[in-house]
Amino acid sequence: CSAFSRSHPALYDQPGGDYTPTKREIAAFEAGIKLGALYHQFVGAPVSSRTAASLEKAMQESISLQPYVREVKVHIDRDMLAANVFGYGELEGRMIEAQVVIDYQGETVTARLQYDQEKDYPLMSLV
């Protein structure tokens, strides 16, 4: 639980317009924010089979700092890593499998980022 979420526990409690989202909707939204941030912050990062584990850890620790995050797991598919002439490659979205557990005021959701081979695209989903 970050300092931000402790100091702003009711961040979404202010009604906006004619609709106030449910706690579950807020938790799902927060999960999407976390996975989107993870994807866009790290795709393109230099990575090799030697550094993949430390990059996974950095990704997990970075996202775990954000509000409402209970758990983060990240796996980089080592079979997809391709080294250039200098011995490393770039992290691609299709290499990332990530899962976040979000707890917003007692409502918990789990979301996943995973490459969909059929669509040839990394997709997020609630699980």
Predicted ranges, named:
Residues 1-127:
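Short beta-strand/helix segments in adaptor/scaffold domains that form protein-protein interfaces
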